[in-house]
Design a protein with these regions (language model features):
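Short, polar/charged alpha-helical segment
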Residues: 51-57, 74-92, 189, 193-195, ...
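Short helix-initiation/N-cap motifs at beta->coil->alpha
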Residues: 99-108, 216-220, 327-341
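Periplasmic solute-binding protein
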Residues: 127-139, 143-147, 163-210, 222, ...
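Glycine-centered hinge/linker elements that transmit conformational signals in sensory
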Residues: 220-226, 265-330, 380-383
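Extracytoplasmic/periplasmic substrate-recognition and gating elements
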Residues: 170, 174, 321-324, 362-442, ...
């Protein structure tokens, strides 16, 4: 690698001009020394070799101004404020990395898809859109890009095999459509210290007949929520009312993700399968063997309005009303996420690990003096309709996406930036800040072995083979932007009480089928587009094996728990 460094440096000096090459490498060396500061899985020489590649590959684009966009989370803030200016200094490509809401990212992307106008040169777009991108073919697939048009700007040491989320961004055609930039799962969060308190353990066992521990099923989660809500924990130094659940319920785009992000599969609505249920996925959309969506309502073989889906929504509403802070019902995702760190919540079933960085700050009431957390994260419990082999949770994989409507020079410059912020040189430091892991080499680094005790189970989760059971939206969803907006609007009606859960889900599945029917009529997705089943009625489909599933006589079986220390 050192020989490569010397050779590429020599070429840069001869071809690019001695002063310019030195200036670029000077900026790179400053970045490596002051920002990376040894926190990389690569050696110093290997880091410099990667920087030299970026310097050389960027020469045709010097002074080109590009714009990229992502949602606003800690990882992307670090990219926008630290990595983007460093990339500009090193390469001469002037990159503006905008931070906007996740719903706005999807809206901008949808506008670019519909208009053909180049709004952004690169998007960090959730892999939930893999089915959309595969069908519309409006993004550059990165398999062909890296071998063809983008070959001269592809980092030789990118090492696609090191990325843990490429199964989420690869379509059934075997092509990679997006490059993961950050990933986070939704897991179960709980107060480890409260659960291990002897008085709490004894009182819980006396009341419910089984041990207080990490809930395996929703029945146990509900019992624990009931047990802690209103419980006096002043003897543990806890002031104010204690709550047994935290969630959010504002009628806002983030309410849609709350349900499409695998809540229904956690309840047991969909079919078995990894990374997503087939033929019925966690949106309740049924697909045929040719990957064509065939229905969403039970009458067409879908499950969006099935008994399991109704159960999923009713339980969330019940727990929000009975066991959560009153203000939670009016909160969106962004406001609710940091709340557990404020001390008075016992547990949260649907907690995004993207909030880990904000929840391990040393001055928080949920942290011990030695820097270890009073809380832990664990696998989420499953609902009454769930069975082994069914998806158990969601994992967000925000991934670099290059639109075909972006001019090639701008796409190449954006691709260089995308690789810079996901490179092995940078990734360990970026993960140390944002804790949203994308590379195996970073997860398994000595650095995170040392940090693991202070991260509440995050490293143990990502080092576990079970992590593949947490996955993003799959390929049954043919047009994510059009379908996603239907969820928050209809679920919002159930949350507000304007409709029952059944009525809201009947409306939702009908609205989804309306979109599927329009796509089928338009024929814009060819052989991969929807092909709706004839309606056969709910009784026919509920009698078939798999999803949709008939209503259970008992939706609250006995609670089951497991001790956290035994679990890990």
């Amino acid at each position: 690698m050192r020989h490569l460094l010397l050779a590429t440096t020599a070429v840069a000096v001869v071809l690019g001009g001695t002063m310019a090459a030195r200036a670029d490498m000077a900026a790179a060396e400053k970045f490596l020394a002051e920002e990376i500061n040894g926190l990389s899985v690569l050696s110093a020489d290997e880091q410099k070799a990667e920087m030299q590649f970026f310097i050389d590959a960027a020469k045709p684009f010097t002074n080109l101004e590009i714009k990229v966009v992502s949602e606003t989370i800690a990882t992307h803030e670090y990219e926008s404020k630290v990595l983007a200016p460093a990339f500009t200094a090193i390469t001469g490509i002037k990159v503006t990395h905008d931070l906007i809401g996740e719903g706005d990212v999807v809206e901008k992307l949808q506008t670019q898809m519909q208009s053909g106008e180049n709004i952004y040169d690169g998007y960090v777009n959730d892999s939930d859109l893999i089915g959309t991108h595969w069908r519309y073919q409006q993004v550059r697939n990165l398999t062909d890009w890296r071998a063809g048009e983008g070959k001269d700007v592809t980092l030789p040491t990118l090492d696609i095999a090191d990325f843990i989320g490429t199964s989420f961004t690869t379509a059934p055609d075997g092509k990679l459509y997006q490059l993961p930039d950050q990933q986070f799962a939704n897991l179960y969060w709980f107060r480890y210290d409260w659960f291990n308190d002897e008085q709490n353990k004894a009182d819980f066992k006396a009341k419910y007949g089984y041990d207080l521990g990490v809930p395996v099923n929703w029945s146990a989660y509900q019992d624990i929520a009931e047990f802690f809500t209103g419980r006096d924990l002043s003897r543990l130094g806890v002031e104010g009312k204690v709550y047994g659940n935290m969630d959010y319920g504002k009628k806002d785009p983030s309410l849609g993700w709350r349900y499409t992000d695998a809540w229904m599969s956690m309840a047991g609505m969909g079919d078995k399968g990894e990374p997503n249920g087939l033929p019925v996925d966690e949106w309740g959309i049924r697909g045929n063997e040719g990957a064509q969506p065939t229905g969403s309502c039970v009458a067409r073989g879908g499950a969006t309005n099935s008994p399991a889906a109704v159960y999923a929504v009713e339980k969330a509403i019940e727990w929000l009303q009975k066991y959560s802070p009153p203000e939670a019902a009016g909160m969106p995702f962004g406001e609710a996420g940091p709340i557990p760190a404020q001390c008075n919540g016992a547990q949260q079933m649907f907690w995004y690990t993207a909030f880990t960085a904000a929840t391990v700050k040393p001055d928080l009431p949920v942290m011990n003096e030695d820097g270890t957390p009073k809380w832990r994260m664990a696998p989420s419990p499953h609902g009454a309709y769930w069975s082994e082999g069914t998806k158990i949770g969601y994992q967000d994989a925000g991934s670099w996406t290059l639109m075909k409507s972006t001019p090639v020079d701008r796409a190449k410059a954006a691709w260089l930036y995308a690789q810079f912020v996901t490179s092995k040189t940078v990734d360990l430091k970026k993960a140390d800040v944002g804790l949203t892991f994308i590379r195996e080499s970073t997860i398994n680094s000595d650095h995170f072995t040392e940090r693991a005790p202070k991260l509440g189970g995050l490293i143990e989760f990502y080092r576990s083979p079970a992590r593949v059971q947490w996955s993003p939206t799959g390929t049954n969803v043919p047009d994510y932007p059009k379908l996603a907006q239907l969820w928050w609007q209809n679920i919002g009606d159930a949350m507000s009480g304007a409709k029952t859960a059944q009525e809201a889900l009947d409306s939702l599945c009908a609205a989804q089928e309306s979109v599927l029917a329009r796509l089928e009529r338009a024929g814009v997705q060819g052989d991969l587009g929807p092909k709706l089943n004839e309606e056969k009625g709910a009784d026919h489909w509920l009698a078939q094996p798999g999803s949709p599933k008939a209503k259970l006589e008992n939706e609250k079986p006995k609670g089951q728990t497991i001790a956290y220390d035994e679990l890990i």
